[in-house]
Design a protein with these regions (language model features):
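Active-site groove signature of glycoside hydrolases
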Residues: 115-134
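Short, acidic/polar
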Residues: 30-43, 100-118, 163-171
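A short, structured active-site edge motif that brings together acidic residues
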Residues: 76-88
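Active-site mouth loops of central-metabolism enzymes
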Residues: 21-34, 93-106, 134
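Conserved, mostly hydrophobic/aromatic
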Residues: 6, 18, 36, 51, ...
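Acidic (Asp/Glu)-rich catalytic clusters
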Residues: 8-10, 67-78, 115-119, 149, ...
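Beta/alpha (TIM)-barrel catalytic core signal, keyed to glycine-rich beta->alpha loops juxtaposed to Asp/Glu
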Residues: 59, 130-324
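N-terminal binding-site loop/beta-alpha segment at the start of enzyme catalytic domains
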Residues: 1-77
Length: 324
């Protein structure tokens, strides 16, 4: 496993981290706690040392599993979690004030609940789970994040940027008040490269790249006949003609890649890791074989320029999550 610095936190984190939304259950069906825990422990054996969870993942279930895993790990594991929006709206909506989303007392209380779930006195990284640039001039969130650090409840703080809106955090980064950003970055959504990544490098901000496989679209396993449990988030994500669109784009991508070595998910992960601004990439890995293959992929290093040029042509502007 290779390691990169998570910006000014100074944490040396594994290039492949663990995205723990799936192990919360609820919106991700088809797995078990036992299977998920085996996968995380295997990833840790192979060098993974960064796990990203959230209070909203299974109403704390993901955090409780992560806490148990960390206690059993026998080595230093960096843990990041998130404060959910109080109004339960993802992504953050324009025109809704921060007093309805992240009031001061709520941020503190949510963090304390997360710490209880995790079985920790301090979390390495606490993040706001959504962000709205209209809040930049308000004091509540600034005071809450500063007090989390002063009180020792969180070592560092960051923000998870709204889906497909990387530029919404540019002014936030310039305030100097956050240490990390989490952003969607993959072959289809390359938009953070334009403005966000240059700024994170300038301000020494850690970058957590989420959704590297586009919720499964870039695994190449989605067909027009693919079915998901109606309780599964992916049933919504791949609704309507979305599966048809994915199949068309993935087929075009495969044609262009030709004989490039590696499977589609391997190439997709290496695409993310070829960006020097990225500190860690956090795929979900609920099965041991996925943990092993993803970590083995990281060992192969960045893609060559010819392959990157091919992938650059496949940026795709879409929003399957729904309009904010």
């Amino acid at each position: 496993m290779n390691y990169r610095r998570l910006g000014r936190t100074g944490f040396e984190v594994s290039e492949i981290g663990y995205g723990a939304w799936g192990i919360g259950g609820a919106q991700w069906q088809g797995g078990t706690d036992e299977e998920s825990m085996r996968a995380v422990h295997r990833a840790i054996e192979l060098g993974l040392n960064f796990i990203d969870t959230a209070l909203a993942y299974g109403d704390g279930h993901s955090e409780r599993l992560v806490g148990k895993i960390v206690r059993e790990a026998g080595r230093r594991i960096y843990v990041a979690t998130k404060v959910p929006p109080k109004n339960q709206l993802w992504p953050a909506r324009r025109g809704i004030g921060i007093d309805q989303v992240f009031p001061y007392d709520y941020v503190i209380e949510s963090t304390e609940t997360s710490l209880k779930n995790l079985g920790m006195e301090t979390v390495d990284l606490q993040q706001l789970h959504v962000w709205n640039p209209e809040w930049i001039g308000r004091d509540e969130w600034k005071r809450a994040l500063e007090d989390l650090k002063k009180s020792g409840k969180a070592r560092f703080v960051g923000v998870s940027i709204n889906d497909h809106q990387p530029d919404s955090a540019l002014e936030l980064i310039r305030t100097g008040l956050i240490d990390t950003v989490q952003v969607i970055y993959n072959v289809f959504d390359q938009s953070p490269e334009r403005n966000l990544f240059p700024l994170t490098e300038q301000f020494n901000i850690g970058v957590i790249a989420r959704v590297p496989l586009d919720e499964g679209a870039l695994t190449g396993a989605i067909t027009e006949e693919t079915k998901f449990d109606e309780r599964d988030f992916r049933d919504y994500y791949f609704r309507g003609d979305h599966k048809k669109q994915v199949v068309e784009h993935v087929n075009a991508l495969r044609r262009d890649l030709g004989n490039v070595d590696g499977s589609l998910p391997e190439i997709a992960l290496r695409f993310c890791l070829s960006e020097p601004a990225v500190s860690t990439v956090i795929p979900g890995m609920r099965r041991v074989r996925h943990a092993e293959s993803n970590i083995a992929t990281a060992e192969k290093g960045p893609l060559d320029e010819k392959t990157m040029a091919v992938l650059r042509r496949h940026a795709w502007e879409k929003n399957f999550y729904g309009e904010p």
